[in-house]
Curated annotation (Swiss-Prot):
Family from the record: Belongs to the reoviridae RNA-directed RNA polymerase family.
BP-aspect Gene Ontology terms: DNA-templated transcription; viral genome replication
Organism: Rotavirus A (strain RVA/Cow/United States/WC3/1981/G6P7[5]) (RV-A)
Domain RdRp catalytic residues, every copy: 501-687
Enzyme class: transferase
EC number annotated for this UniProt entry: 2.7.7.48
Needed co-factor(s): Mg(2+)
InterPro entries: DNA/RNA_pol_sf, RNA-dir_pol_4-hel_dom, RNA-dir_pol_luteovirus, RNA-dir_pol_reovirus, Rotavirus_VP1_C
GO-annotated cellular components: virion component
GO molecular function, a single term: nucleotide binding
Protein name: RNA-directed RNA polymerase
Pfam families, per the entry: RdRP_4, Rotavirus_VP1
Coarse class of the protein's main subcellular location: virion
Subcellular location: Virion
Length: 1088
């Protein structure tokens, strides 16, 4: 097996380098004779080490085990005291420690002062402004770097340069940390006052960021960027990232387009060799110069110089360096402010009387009309979702905080919890559940706040509203989103599109007589001026809608929604400030409502339309596209004449002046060739993404385990890598080793092997080969997968007790009764399971499950339990298929231009050969006829797993399932008796398999799986008519071909001769595939 086990063994001898340390490898095998040898080998190793005898002889004696069995884990003993980090660090602490400049940041606590200066006593201390919020420690991070450095000190040539660059940067970190001593973390990986009081407050988070940056250094340019950011971020904890990334919004406007990809009528990307010149007025260069000056004022030298040098010829070839700077700037870590400052920030905007009422009127009307347009059809037709909005809300209620901790009784158990789902159950049990009354959020009941931290931006506050707000808004917002799904203007929601489609949309209309206007409206969304017109527009829309129906329940839904808007127009928030809780009248819009995303998109669309209608009084142009994407909006305007510098400048100034008339503090820019928005930027006709995901600092703490976080770390590393920011893979693997190790006692630790962590099981954390998802098909792989499946789900006593209480049971049966027209076990069980799963966010339950999981894992890692499972996984299917394929060499020419320059070479090569896709493959079954039928009559949304289970039942059972969900008998009969039903079987199976194979994640989401170039490498003679089997054979072949190409940069072709007799067997098996959830799949999902 691969590199991981090798590094693991080297890492262990690096960490435990004393005489007393022992490493015992544990092997397993699916072959019973060899397995017995494995067991013998293990017990002899234990015996020898207990008696202080060396293990070398055993390794020779049991060479058959070492050569033929699979490494399961490594057991490591060490009686060493744990000051090893400090000892090793001294060797590297040869430089001059950094001194923080304590005047850089406006807010006193953002300066990197000694902790006791910021917080004189332990009572005042909080780690919330510098908490790395990750389940790994600074000492582990230092160890991982020192391990890498020691391993590579004898590198040669180019590798030696990388070593020297990193060593130089680590010297800065080591010297600074060593000056104060390595802060020791507690068992929750937090840094307490006693540890921090004599050290700079931001030392830990700074060191983590710096380590992340220095381990991402390869070239000399990387080194210069990293050095500057590491040194300056030690002092500047507030504006550094913003300063460094600001110029990008202008840089994208400077590069000529010479050939680009555009979206064609079929929504595919096609190459266009058009040439568009960048028209840049002097004013733009002045603004850029100002930005570079601001950077220099802040002490930056190398980075502004790189940008200055690039400006000489503004070439797309050298643009990736600009992209790199832009990505690196985020890796200085999160800016975490006090809640009070975050809230006051939005309240400081001056209110002027001098605004254009006419524009505000137009803005409000546009919001009103859009709300009406979105909801008109469902309201007129008395849509059942709007009738049963309360039930729909309850079914999709989250288990997030409800804003206050309450004492709740479940049977004989009394617990304290803040979770929404538990509050709802408790309220129902005690007759306090009144969804028809939306509680006020005024001065008597101010809103508690959550927070959102982002690198390079101020902290934003989030409303934690009572659950009644969610129930009132859910159904209506869902209907708005359905409308947005087939409206191109809403880039974020547009049906199954991905970022590449939006890219082709912009470049489509760029030409010498058009310009693109792009605006960052994030300031506007949270500004006070927006709130009244915004809420009023929505209210007016709801009033108009209420007149379009006579259905009392629909009117009630609209009225409750309206009430949430009315209440929020008079909102107060509560902010803890020291001991007191301050109540502040908060007149701005904040995130936290269900409608946040949808409503902001509506408002931003209304805003750009208002501005454009003003501009059109002065210029004559055609609006080719208008798009809104989150906090950004953009539009392409086509004029009758060629665009000149003067025109760009005039339009730009007029647009800004128009925004100013609404007192909207937004950043509006006009360009002829590119745009920059939060999600992506287009320069020189190519698309770029910011690779700004922090690896060693997290935004907030959740209830995920170390394993989960190791998987998230790997997943973040992959996303960054696809976007052009590469961190040393060995370092990432070292972090995974540290984070997945399990302590047995103080001196005894167990480290799982690569096989355990990469096999597609409930414990999967990473892929042995980046970008390639392998599904093991060897005996040992399937054996271990089976073993892990035997201990997959852990029980929790607390959860069982809650689930057995009448409060819980009554709640679940109440949901079932409201939803179902007749008995339906599948749905009832499903609801109960979903509700029980929501309990996991209650800490004591997740802790209990974690402990059980770990003890089961410990047993398993020392000796896998043989477990004959009847469950079939996707691995079994692929294992059956594999033998019937024969491989031969093939050749595919490169035939597409690059349009995503930051991709790693091996991924880029595949796109250049087979092309890319601009759509998401449907993997949730929502396009199937049965799913549409259910959503036509019921608010219940079955998961892909449930659809997969239901569609394979007997026809009469499917009928009963449908009828119980309120589908009229005639419709259910028609469905089962029609061709559509057999098409559905195939379609749902297809969706389910796509889902299992994570086809929309990682780099697979970039490839065109239906590429004719790919198809011609695969030959499968057509036998018998089982489309499902043909599908899986083709998909397997495509994945094999693509994986081979990623790994080797060359193509193979596959021929399959699948016997007819086997087909029916395989088809039967395909209806019993179990899906596996793992930290790895969670991390993928988390990216979404």
């Amino acid at each position: 097996m691969g590199k991981y086990n090798l590094i693991l063994s080297e890492y262990l001898s690096f960490i435990y380098n004393s005489q007393s340390a022992v490493q015992i490898p544990i092997y397993y095998s699916s072959n019973s004779e060899l397995e017995n040898r494995c067991i013998e080998f293990h017990s002899k190793c234990l015996e020898n080490s207990k008696n202080g005898l060396p293990l070398k002889k055993l390794f020779v004696e049991y060479s058959d085990v070492i050569e033929n069995a699979t490494l399961l884990s490594i057991l490591s003993y060490s009686y060493d005291k744990y000051n090893a980090v400090e000892r090793k660090l001294v060797k590297y602490a040869k430089g001059k420690p950094l001194e923080a400049d304590l005047t850089v940041n406006e807010l006193d606590y953002e300066n990197n002062k000694i902790t006791s200066e910021l917080f004189p006593t332990a009572e005042e201390y909080t780690d919330s402004l510098m908490d790395p919020a990750i389940l790994t420690s600074l000492s582990s991070n230092l160890n991982a770097v020192m391990f890498w450095l020691e391993k590579h000190e004898n590198d040669a040539a180019e590798k030696l340069k990388i070593y020297k660059r990193r060593l130089d940067l680590f010297t800065i970190v080591a010297s600074t940390v060593n000056k104060y001593g390595v802060p020791r973390h507690n068992e929750k990986y937090r840094y307490e006052y006693e540890v921090m009081k004599d050290k700079p407050y931001y030392l830990v988070t700074w060191a983590n960021s710096s380590i992340e940056m220095l381990m991402s250094v390869f070239s000399h340019e990387d080194y210069l960027i990293a050095r500057e950011l590491i040194v300056l971020s030690y002092s500047n904890r507030s504006t550094l990232a913003k300063l460094v990334s600001s110029p990008m919004s202008i840089l994208v406007a400077l590069v000529d387009i010479n050939g680009t990809f555009i979206t064609n009528e079929e929504l595919e990307l096609e190459f266009s060799n058009k040439y568009v010149r960048a028209i840049v007025p002097d004013q733009t260069f002045d603004e850029l110069k100002q930005m570079l000056d601001n950077m220099r004022k802040a002490g930056l030298t190398d980075i502004p110089k790189m940008i200055q040098d690039w400006l000489a010829d503004c070439s797309i070839e050298k643009f990736p360096l600009m992209a790199k700077i832009y990505s690196w700037s985020f890796h200085v870590g999160f800016r975490k402010q006090k809640m009070l400052d975050a809230a006051l920030d939005q309240l400081k905007t001056e209110y002027t009387e001098d605004i254009d009422d006419e524009m505000y009127r137009e803005y409000t009307m546009l919001i009103r009309d859009e709300v009406v347009k979105m909801l008109k059809e469902p309201v007129k037709h008395d849509d059942h979702l709007l009738q049963d909005s309360e039930l729909a809300g309850l079914l999709s209620m989250s288990s997030a905080s409800n804003g206050e901790s309450r004492q709740l009784k479940f049977g004989r158990k009394t617990i304290f919890s803040t979770k929404k789902n538990m509050h709802v159950m408790d309220d129902m049990a005690n007759g306090r559940y009144t969804p028809g009354i939306i509680p006020p959020v005024n001065v008597d009941k101010p809103i508690p706040l959550g927070r959102r931290d982002v690198p390079g931006r101020r902290t934003r506050i989030i409303f934690i509203l009572p659950y009644e707000y969610f129930i009132a808004q859910h159904a209506v917002v869902e209907k708005m989103l359905i409308y947005a799904k087939h409206t191109r203007e809403y880039a974020e929601f547009y049906s199954q599109s991905n970022q590449l489609l939006s890219y082709g949309d912009v470049t489509r209309f760029l030409s010498n007589n058009s310009m693109v206007l792009y605006t960052d409206v994030s300031q506007w969304d949270s500004s006070q001026h927006n709130t009244q017109p915004f809420r009023k527009g929505i209210i007016m829309g709801l009033d108009m809608l209420a007149n379009m129906t006579n259905d009392a329940r629909v009117i009630q839904t609209l009225n409750l929604y309206k009430q949430t808007q009315i209440n929020l127009m008079d909102s107060y928030v509560q902010i803890p400030d020291g001991d007191v809780i301050k109540k502040i009248q908060y007149g701005a819009v904040a995130s936290g409502e269900k409608q946040t995303k949808a409503a902001n998109s509506i408002a931003n669309l209304a805003l750009i339309k208002t501005v454009l209608s003003r501009i059109s009084n002065k210029y004559s142009f055609a609006t080719k596209i208008i798009r809104v994407d989150g906090d950004d909006n953009y539009a392409v305007l086509q004029f009758n004449t060629e665009v000149t510098k003067q025109m760009v400048q005039d339009v730009s100034n007029d647009v800004r002046e128009t925004y100013a008339r609404m007192n909207a503090k937004v950043k509006a820019l006009v360009s002829t060739v590119g745009i920059e928005i939060a999600k992506r930027y287009i320069a020189g006709g190519k698309i770029f993404f910011r690779a700004g995901i922090n690896l060693l600092n997290n935004e907030k703490r959740g209830q995920s385990t170390q394993w989960d976080q190791a998987a998230v770390l790997y997943s973040n590393y992959i996303v960054n890598r696809l976007r052009g920011f590469e961190t040393d893979r060995e370092f990432i693997l070292t972090k995974i080793m540290q984070m997945t190790s399990v302590a047995i006692t103080g001196s005894l630790r167990l480290f799982p092997s690569e096989r355990v962590l990469t096999t597609n099981s409930t414990f999967k954390v990473f892929d042995s080969e980046d970008f390639i998802i392998e599904y093991g098909t060897t005996d040992d792989e399937v054996y271990i997968q089976r073993a892990f499946m035997s201990l997959s789900s852990q029980k929790s006593g607390i959860a069982d007790e809650i689930a057995a209480s009448s409060t819980f049971k009554n709640y679940v049966s109440r949901l079932s009764e409201q939803l179902l027209f007749s008995k339906n076990n599948i749905v009832s069980k499903g609801i109960a399971l979903t509700e029980k799963a929501k309990l996991n966010s209650y800490a004591p339950i997740s802790l209990e499950k974690r402990r059980a999981q770990i003890s089961a894992l410990l047993t398993m890692l020392q000796k896998p339990v043989t477990f004959k499972s009847s469950k079939i996984t996707i691995n079994d299917i692929l294992r059956d298929i594999k033998p019937f394929f024969t491989v031969s060499e093939a050749h595919l020419p490169i035939q597409y231009q690059k349009f995503m320059p930051t991709l790693p070479d091996n991924v880029q090569y595949i796109i250049q050969c087979i092309g890319s896709r601009t759509y998401q493959i449907e993997d949730d079954g929502s396009k199937s006829a049965i799913s549409r039928l259910i959503s036509k009559y019921s608010v219940y949304k079955p998961s892909i797993e449930e659809l997969y289970k239901v569609i394979s039942l007997h026809e009469n059972e499917i009928q009963l399932y449908l009828i119980s969900l309120g589908i009229p008998k005639i419709d259910a009969d028609t469905y089962v008796g029609s061709k559509i039903y057999s098409q559905d079987k195939y379609r749902i199976l297809e969706s389910y398999v796509y889902n299992l194979l994570s086809i929309n994640y990682g780099c697979y989401q970039l490839f065109d799986f239906n590429s004719p170039d790919l198809e011609k490498l695969i030959r499968i003679p057509f036998k018998g008519k089982i489309p499902a089997v043909t599908f899986i054979l083709h998909l397997y072949a495509k994945l094999e071909v693509i994986n081979h190409a990623i790994k080797n940069g060359s193509w193979i072709s596959l021929f399959c001769n699948y016997p007819k007799s086997e087909m029916i067997k395989l088809w039967k098996k395909m209806w019993n595939i179990t899906s596996l959830r793992s930290p790895y799949t969670n991390a993928n999902f988390f990216q979404d």
